[in-house]
Amino acid sequence: MSNVVTDPTNSKIQVRDLNFYYGKFHALKNISLDIEKNKVTAFIGPSGCGKSTLLRTFNKMFQLYPEQRAEGEILLDGQNILTDSQDVALLRAKVGMVFQKPTPFPMSIYDNIAFGVRLFEKLSRADMDERVQWALTKAALWSETKDKLHQSGYSLSGGQQQRLCIARGIAIRPEVLLLDEPCSALDPISTSRIEELITELKQDYTVVIVTHNMQQAARCSDYTAFMYLGELIEFSDTDKLFTAPAQRQTEDYITGRYG
């Protein structure tokens, strides 16, 4: 693997010798990398390479499934989240996630945003109103929803629903936002809106995105990790990785020779 180029003094997440298993299947093999604070890091690679698996270790989603296990260290602000003592609810408040398909809750737009906040904070109605407006504004959705906050989240278009999910994710004020192929089900215009939003979000959050779309990774991210068959092949500054990859496998993938 090529050298990790992020600034270790500014790392939000540090992955050290991470191995991950689905039962007996060895899905991630000795992964080590640093995720820099207030930057966008993209994971790319062919289907089945382990990029979504790696993403989901950052908030321990795998704990929902007894046959899945992780070994090694994932340090969030220097604390290893893989220990049994880690409070998973608090971890997921710090590390939010947006999935591939928009997943609005079956409730109003307002309550979609307020739902998670109520789990962690007791706000007055006025403060909650302010938080809902803040989150929708951050997600570039306020102007489109301010007059219909009490309509169902399902009444929104697909692109709007995904921005609603992003707003819901940031409403609890996490420190890290994980995006698992957030644009794969969206049209080009909605995709463009999400990409603009990702660029803006890094001012306040550390963003990690999994994408099949190499052009999207090139447009949105500061750093890119290329994975293949559970291994981290190359991790570099995005511009460098796409213009002068250090590894032949990386070059073959980004030029379409395989994957």
Curated annotation (Swiss-Prot):
It is found in: Cell inner membrane. Belongs to the ABC transporter superfamily. Phosphate importer (TC 3.A.1.7) family. Its main location: membrane. PANTHER family: ABC TRANSPORTER I FAMILY MEMBER 17, PHOSPHATE IMPORT ATP-BINDING PROTEIN PSTB. GO terms for cellular component: plasma membrane. One of its GO terms (biological process) is phosphate ion transmembrane transport. The complex is composed of two ATP-binding proteins (PstB), two transmembrane proteins (PstC and PstA) and a solute-binding protein (PstS). ATP binds at residues 45-52. It is a peripheral membrane protein. GO terms for molecular function: ATP binding; ATP hydrolysis activity; ATPase-coupled phosphate ion transmembrane transporter activity. Residues 13-254 form the ABC transporter domain. Disulfide bonds: none annotated. The lineage of its organism: Bacteria, Pseudomonadati, Pseudomonadota, Gammaproteobacteria, Enterobacterales. It is an enzyme of class 7 (translocase). This is Phosphate import ATP-binding protein PstB. SUPFAM superfamilies: P-loop containing nucleoside triphosphate hydrolases (SSF52540). It comes from Edwardsiella tarda. It catalyses: phosphate(out) + ATP + H2O = ADP + 2 phosphate(in) + H(+).
